[in-house]
Design a protein with these regions (language model features):
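Local sequence-structure signature of Cys/Sec-based thiol-disulfide redox active-site neighborhoods
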Residues: 19-60, 64
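Short, solvent-exposed loop/linker segments at the N-terminal edge
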Residues: 131-136, 282-290
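Short, conserved sequence motifs used for protein processing/export or organelle targeting and
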Residues: 57-271
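Acidic, Ser/Thr
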Residues: 295-296
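General secretory precursor processing signal
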Residues: 41-44, 277, 289
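Generic recognition of flexible, low-complexity loop/linker segments
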Residues: 18, 226-230, 281
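Short, solvent-exposed loop/edge segments of extracellular or virion-exposed proteins
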Residues: 32, 276-287
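Bacterial Sec-dependent N-terminal signal peptides
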Residues: 1-21, 159, 267-268, 272-275, ...
């Protein structure tokens, strides 16, 4: 009985590879509803950027584009439209902070960010994204560790792909000089796709001490948007994962925690190193220790 109990606790606490088991404060996701033709949106981008600078690695932004004509760069997506309508965005710019309200607020509320950033998170999120550049295959591993019990027996895990550095038109882009160069605007944190279902994959159990690991294989599209789509540059991608508490109406909210997943461009093929040659260094020296050069 003692042995079985010991192994059980080892598996629960030490099986994780990426996520910490220590209590942490909540991170924040700003879902910003924006558009290239929106006259006030560049200022909202600037405000969101300043919040990111204030809370590095704690605040993340997903810019969901609407309010646009289908000209290049067409940043509107079907999934983005579903989220926009469900989260109550009826004007631009507007935002949801951790999906905490029935409808989106105008602009970006730093006040709401400040509230959430001080709260303890019920769960921590970690993981890794490895992309095989040749096949454009992303292998996404997400770990969720529950530091405290969730309010619900079932939560929802969502993984999103965002893209930086998409150049194109932005109404009043000069109001955000950080992203405006020679009349061209650099669109950042652009929502591109959801790897899970729109409102997340169900995860359980959600009680304290539970570790959940999910792995996804995703083929990164060459282009997103129709018509006037945008090339999906692998080097400009980032992936975020967040956990929501429950389904309320058609959407899952509020967000319990969010994290950006580390991103590597590499291969999933196994590597088998072999020794090709071994040679002595300074082999004329008399000593009990030897130095070797090994070619692999």
């Amino acid at each position: 009985l003692f042995t079985a109990t010991l192994l059980y606790h080892v598996n629960r606490v030490f099986a994780q590879q990426y996520v910490t088991t220590e209590p942490l404060l909540k991170n924040v996701l700003i879902e910003e509803f924006t558009g290239r033709n929106c006259p006030g949106c560049s200022q909202a981008h600037l405000l969101a950027n300043n919040i990111i600078k204030k809370y590095p690695k704690r605040v993340f932004v997903s810019n969901i584009y609407g309010f646009d004509t289908p000209t290049y760069p067409n940043l509107v997506t079907q999934e983005g439209n579903i989220i926009t309508h469900a989260l109550g965005a009826t004007a631009y710019p507007s935002s949801q902070i951790n999906r905490s309200k029935d409808s989106a607020d105008l602009g970006v509320s730093e006040h709401d960010v400040n509230l959430f950033i001080k709260q303890e998170a019920p769960c921590n999120i970690g993981g890794l994204v490895v992309v095989d550049e040749l096949s454009r295959t992303a292998t996404i591993t997400v770990e969720i560790y529950y530091v405290h019990d969730s309010d619900n027996d079932v939560n929802y895990l969502t993984v999103e792909m965002l893209q930086d550095s998409i150049w194109g038109y932005q109404n009043n882009g000069m109001n955000n000089p950080e992203q405006y160069v020679d009349g061209n605007y650099c669109h950042m944190h652009v929502f591109r796709d959801i790897i899970t279902s729109t409102w997340g994959e169900t995860i359980s159990p959600t009680n304290e001490g539970t570790l959940i690991t999910k792995t996804y294989t995703y083929i990164i599209p060459e282009i997103i948007g129709d018509p006037s789509g945008v090339d999906v540059n692998i080097n400009h991608l980032k992936f975020i994962a967040f956990v929501t508490n429950e389904m309320i109406g058609a959407e899952s909210r509020p967000i319990l925690n969010v994290a950006r997943l580390p991103f590597l461009i590499g291969t999933q093929e196994e590597v088998f190193p072999c020794i090709d040659d071994i040679s002595y260094k300074d082999n004329s020296m008399c000593s009990n220790s030897k130095s070797f050069t090994i070619d692999m």
